[in-house]
Amino acid sequence: MQNQRIRIRLKAFDYKLIDASTAEIVETAKRTGAQVRGPIPLPTRKERFTVLISPHVNKDARDQYEIRTHKRLIDIVEPTDKTVDALMRLDLAAGVDVQISLG
């Protein structure tokens, strides 16, 4: 697996979950002898929703809700076979979306 790179993108609504998952991935990769770049925090996406509270009138009465999507990027440079096996066996939290690309 020489001259290859593994790029891992993580997404989650909870920043504590995503930070714990990135720490676990980085620690696993370093333990198996790979060089790690990151975690790189990417911009947080904020979706805002405005909802009318009153069922009939009073347009001034509104609630605002927000969903934040936190993202991290990890590059594993020169991964070994042990690194790939360890990453495949890794069990991450349920609220974290993981996208892996080889390049």
From Swiss-Prot:
Pfam family, one: Ribosomal_S10
GO terms, biological process: translation
UniProt keyword Ribosomal protein present: yes
GO molecular function, one term: structural constituent of ribosome
Coiled coil: none
UniProt keyword terms in alphabetical order: Ribonucleoprotein, Ribosomal protein
Classification via InterPro entries: Ribosomal_uS10, Ribosomal_uS10_CS, Ribosomal_uS10_dom, Ribosomal_uS10_dom_sf
PANTHER family documented for this protein: 30S RIBOSOMAL PROTEIN S10 FAMILY MEMBER
Role: Involved in the binding of tRNA to the ribosomes.
Family, as annotated: Belongs to the universal ribosomal protein uS10 family.
Name of this protein: Small ribosomal subunit protein uS10
Organism per entry: Vibrio cholerae serotype O1 (strain ATCC 39541 / Classical Ogawa 395 / O395)
Gene (name only): rpsJ
